[in-house]
């Protein structure tokens, strides 16, 4: 079995790790072992952060929609339920953008949701009377 010398491959992989660690504090950017630990840790945080970003944006959108709903005299949950009852399928990102930039359009959506809820409630009451 031939002897394996890892000179160029080892140097390349170490350079790659140290390049990723550039800008880290003290030995974390200079010594391979410390850089390796710091890079691994950083990559774990980056992975988690990509998942958290989705959660954080959804929470932000819900807060913005809720604020506009309250201004229109409706709670967030009733607004979303009313939109579903009206057959409108807008996602939270679009609703938050409309709430932030076009108040008149959002008020129209809120009125549409209110009317759909009223129709649904009257249908429920009619069924109860029978």
From Swiss-Prot:
Belongs to the bacterial ribosomal protein bL20 family. HAMAP family: Ribosomal_bL20 (MF_00382). NCBIfam families: rplT_bact. Binds directly to 23S ribosomal RNA and is necessary for the in vitro assembly process of the 50S ribosomal subunit. It is not involved in the protein synthesizing functions of that subunit. The keyword Heme does not apply. It comes from the Bacteria. The keyword Nucleotide-binding does not apply. One of its GO terms (molecular function) is rRNA binding. Pfam families: Ribosomal_L20. This is Large ribosomal subunit protein bL20. It comes from Solibacter usitatus (strain Ellin6076). One of its GO terms (cellular component) is ribonucleoprotein complex. PROSITE patterns: RIBOSOMAL_L20. Keywords: Ribonucleoprotein, Ribosomal protein, RNA-binding, rRNA-binding. GO terms for biological process: ribosomal large subunit assembly; translation.
